[in-house]
């Protein structure tokens, strides 16, 4: 039995780990049942992939010299479910191609990306689920099932964003897109109040490739929701040349301003010079910058460094109808507890199939708060109050999953998910999927 801790180190669970090995490679496959939680490579710090006093099924990491099957005409790639986004992109870059969606951390595996239907800063256009051609899963009846939009389509849609409730994802075929430019034009815009906030995130400009922002909840009611936002556009005419060989395209890393670099190294160590995203936040209103491998992973690195020095992050999924009310309560609580925080709000992801998908429907509020008594009190208050607003902490981060919350947050989508699951598999999703029994009202 192994012990797993949540990303903030505040909660731990004990689970028995069992390994799945592909029969084709001479390994042993064994009968599993619905009490198993699919854990993939076991690299996730999210407790949703570890069952307390239960069983987890994992897949051994593949060889370092792994190969991918790529079809340049169709722009698709065949991969193992335990290949990471960064490994695939490094390979695809050599052909002038890339994955259309990259999550916040580069080492996330494809299986995890499918199970949580991850998204990047282009989530207002599409999520990772829209980029999947097909995959194979090992069901809880020990059956290997091929799934696509045309073959076993119900299982295909239930698996995307289904957190492993249909079985263990083994491999996948994914879409790639051409890298049409190496430069992005980033425009920074001021947002004065909640009305401008709504207008900013409802932008339907087809040329946008990314959009995000930071909003201050310490302001007065008139300026509530104010802050600034970024909009990213590709700069045409900078098309890269590529070849047919397995090579990677690299660029020299930008250096942070010397004063910032020196301070960062002093506070956080030598890894700080890799946190390029901080530089972009310090730039002037408009900027041009080169695309580089793992662009969003540097943000992940930045937060990991902060966490190791006394910071932590909370994310909530809030229904559209309630998010302004919820934000107002957050602002009130900040003042009440004299807490210090910044808030990031991203536009809701779009679900193409109308299926229940845990990928951030509603509005995500990321609160990065310095560890202190006042901030812990603030966080506990917000966690307990979230459910009264129909909001839940992001389950991919906090592993909180209760059927009553799911139904309230997702409504008809949740009912469709349950009914389709029961129609296909003859019963409800696994118990750990609906309520893992670890969390109750006092530690929500």
Please provide the spans of the model-predicted regions:
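C-terminal structural cap/anchor segments
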Residues: 316-369
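A short glycine-rich, hydrophobically flanked beta-strand micro-motif that places a catalytic Asp/Glu
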Residues: 210-216, 311-316, 339-352, 393-399
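Glycine-rich N-terminal segment of FAD-binding domains in flavoprotein oxidoreductases
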Residues: 8-107, 117-122, 346, 395-398
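Short glycine/threonine-rich loop-to-helix capping motif typified by GTGT followed
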Residues: 224-233, 283-289, 351-363, 406-415
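Activity-critical C-terminal alpha-helical subdomain
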Residues: 300, 374-380, 387-444
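C-terminal substrate-binding/cap subdomain adjacent to the FAD-binding core in PCMH-type
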Residues: 115, 133-325, 329-332
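Extended C-terminal subregions enriched in glycine
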Residues: 81, 323, 334-337, 364-366, ...
């Amino acid at each position: 039995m192994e012990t797993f801790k949540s990303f903030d180190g505040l909660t731990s669970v004990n689970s028995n780990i069992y390994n799945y090995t592909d029969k084709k490679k001479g390994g042993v496959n064994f009968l599993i049942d619905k009490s198993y939680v699919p854990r993939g490579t076991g690299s996730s710090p999210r407790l949703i992939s570890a069952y307390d006093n239960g069983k987890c099924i994992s897949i051994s990491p593949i060889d370092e010299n792994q190969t991918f099957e790529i079809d340049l005409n169709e722009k698709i790639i065949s991969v193992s479910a335990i290949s990471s986004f960064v490994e695939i992109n490094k390979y695809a870059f050599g052909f002038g191609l890339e994955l259309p969606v990259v999550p916040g951390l580069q080492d996330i595996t494809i299986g995890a990306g499918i199970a949580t239907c991850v998204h990047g800063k282009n989530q207002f256009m599409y999520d990772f689920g829209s980029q999947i051609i097909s995959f194979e899963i090992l069901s809880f009846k020990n059956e290997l099932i091929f799934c696509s939009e045309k073959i076993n389509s119900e299982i295909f849609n239930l698996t995307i964003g289904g957190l492993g409730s249909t079985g263990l994802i083994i491999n996948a075929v994914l879409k790639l897109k051409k890298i049409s430019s190496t430069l992005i034009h980033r425009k920074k815009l001021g947002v004065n109040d909640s009305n401008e906030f709504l207008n900013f995130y409802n932008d339907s400009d087809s040329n946008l490739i990314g959009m995000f922002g930071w909003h201050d909840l310490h302001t007065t009611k008139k300026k509530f929701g104010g802050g600034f936002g970024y909009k990213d556009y590709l700069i045409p005419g900078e098309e890269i040349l590529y070849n047919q060989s397995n090579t990677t395209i690299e660029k020299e890393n930008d250096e942070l301003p010397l004063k910032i670099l020196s301070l960062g190294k002093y506070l956080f160590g030598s890894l700080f010079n890799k946190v390029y995203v901080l530089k972009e936040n310090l730039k002037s209103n408009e900027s041009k910058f080169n695309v580089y491998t793992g662009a969003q992973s540097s943000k992940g690195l930045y937060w990991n460094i902060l966490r190791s020095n006394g910071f932590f992050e909370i994310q909530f999924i809030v229904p559209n109808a309630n998010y302004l009310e919820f934000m107002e309560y957050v602002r009130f609580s900040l003042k009440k507890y004299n807490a210090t925080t910044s808030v990031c709000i991203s536009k809701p992801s779009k679900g193409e199939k109308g299926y229940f998908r845990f990928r951030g429907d509603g509005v995500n509020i990321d609160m990065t708060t310095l560890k202190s008594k006042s901030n812990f009190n603030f966080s506990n208050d917000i966690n307990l109050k979230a459910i009264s607003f129909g909001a839940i902490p992001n389950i991919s981060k906090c592993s909180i999953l209760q059927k009553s919350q799911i139904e309230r947050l997702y409504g008809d989508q949740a009912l469709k998910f349950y009914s389709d699951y029961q129609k296909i598999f003859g019963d409800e999703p696994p118990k750990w999927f609906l309520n893992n029994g670890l969390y109750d009202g006092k530690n929500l």
